[in-house]
Amino acid sequence: MKNWFAALLLAVPMSAAVASGGGHYEKVDIDLRDQVSLQHGAQIFTNYCLSCHSASGMRFNRLKDIGLTDEEIKKNLMFTTDNVGDVMHSAMNPKDAAKWFGAAPPDLTLIARSKGADYL
């Protein structure tokens, strides 16, 4: 009984604090001329996000738009395919993802288009 009471005392104030957060996102300042930063972001995305999420609205060869060569893309950013013209699919099987997480992680190109860069 004491444990339930202690849990209740902790849960109520914490839920109120979380609920009052308001879901405010800070404005992201993206400089599309900073190619080094964009290349670093592409590396972060392919190394971490693309493990679970797909980006089926984006092809690897579009990374040439930020100054990368085909060789750099193949060597540093491609892990699931050998064709630079392929779309960015998740390394994870969607059925496994749904089993592990309850739902497959969303495609991030759709999220970026619908909710904007500030959301990501």
Enumerate the language-model features and the residues they cover.
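Positively charged n-region of N-terminal signal peptides that target proteins for export
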Residues: 1-7
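Bacterial N-terminal signal peptides
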Residues: 7-16
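Electrostatic cytochrome c docking/interface patches
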Residues: 19-43, 54-65, 72-74
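Solvent-exposed, acidic/flexible segments
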Residues: 31-38, 42, 98-101, 113-117
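C-type cytochrome heme c attachment motif
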Residues: 43-54, 94, 104-115
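Structured domain cores in non-transmembrane regions
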Residues: 63-99, 103-105, 111
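Short, conserved charged micro-motifs
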Residues: 68, 116-120
